Amino acid sequence: HRNWQYHPRYKDIHKPGTIPLPGTFEDKYDNRAAAAAAAKMRIKSDMVYEDLGLVQPEGGADLAGQRMLNGVSDWYQARKVPELKSDETITVICAETGENFTFDDPKAFAEFKYQRYMSRYLRTVQAVDDGVGKILDTLDTLGINQNTIVIYTSDQGFFLGEHGWFDKRFMYEESFQ
């Protein structure tokens, strides 16, 4: 789940900019249920700064973006990274390195968010893969791999940019693969 904090040993894999954009990333939802168009799980408009490893600016909604959850206790202050409009410019700051990224193109900014999300998500999931691998290796080492059943369960996975989404609110085929 959010916020995809990966172990430092994974910082050099799945670099932003190397992950292919899904063909449905800019889905307009024309042939989908109304819920698909109304869903609040769009990479371009619904991710918070922490999701992307970015510094959240201080201030109100005009400066820092809309709260992720309105009407919730004041302790939860996560703000959505704004969706860039065609006549705007935005600068965001990497929380890890302090690097500034400036955008004036909404499409490029949405793709930047996708790359940041995917990089962080895949690095985090790599730890799960490695952990399961260690269990299987231990079973081999102990010589009990042939008479041991390993059952791994989870709910459906996150969308990885398909239809422009992150999260797992819909059970579309992509979130099961």
Ranges and model annotations:
Residues H1-Q146, I151-S154, F158-Q177:
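Active-site-proximal cap/lid insertion segments
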